[in-house]
Amino acid sequence: MKRSRKFSSSTTTTTVIHTFYNDHTTPPATKEIPIETPLPATKANVKTNATAAAARIQSGYRSYRIRNLYKKISSINREANRVQSIIQRQETVDAIRSDEKERLRMNETLMALLLKLDSVPGLDPTIREARRKVSRKIVGMQEILDSISETKDEIQWWNYNDLGGVDSGQGGGAWPLYWEEAVEEEMCRERGGEEMERFCAQYLGFRCFQRFLRE
């Protein structure tokens, strides 16, 4: 019978720490961070950009206001055209002649339009010119109303020669002339020169302009 032997082995690990001392002193490393100073030209560019931006904003706001003001003038002009079409009717002329309140009512309507025009600031030459043009139209209609009222008993409104007059046994009360023709004759007699030429061409039509040239 054999004997068996068991051998056991053990391993020992030793850790040796070596510390090295550096006798030479190493200076700490430094890192330089450059600081850039803006040049004066850069500051000028920033200021210029801000000024340009402000100018664009002001220009946009001005254009916005001008558009709104022009729309307001256009609205007043449309209303003036409507009143003008009413005044051109023969029944309106008859009402103005027979009723003083009707003339006052029409005058108040025209004055209200003039007040609306006065409330429009003249920020731009285009706005001022448009406002002036509509104002002249309204003032011209006021003059027509006054002429209708003031000349209701004068010969240009009755034309007795064409009717036969009182001597022929016919009373008044007829309207041989339309209001446009009567007003045109009145205006052509009162005014003259280039001013009347422009007024006739712009407001009273081609017939008045022809009459003005004949005279």
Curated annotation (Swiss-Prot):
Q: Which residues form the BAG domain?
A: 72-149
Q: Give the location in the cell.
A: Mitochondrion
**Keyword Chaperone tagged:** yes
Where does the IQ domain start and stop, copy by copy?
50-79
Q: Which SUPFAM superfamilies match?
A: BAG domain (SSF63491)
Single Gene Ontology MF annotation: protein-folding chaperone binding
The UniProt entry, under InterPro entries, shows: BAG5/6/7/8 (IPR040400), BAG_dom_sf (IPR036533), BAG_domain (IPR003103)
Q: Name one Pfam family in it.
A: BAG
Q: Name one GO cellular component term.
A: mitochondrion
Q: Where is the transit peptide?
A: 1-14
Quote the entry's note on domains.
IQ domain mediates interaction with calmodulin.
On assembly, the entry states: Binds to the ATPase domain of HSP70/HSC70 chaperones. Interacts with HSP70-1.
What protein does this entry describe?
BAG family molecular chaperone regulator 5, mitochondrial
Instruction: Record the organism.
Output: Arabidopsis thaliana
Q: Which gene encodes it?
A: BAG5
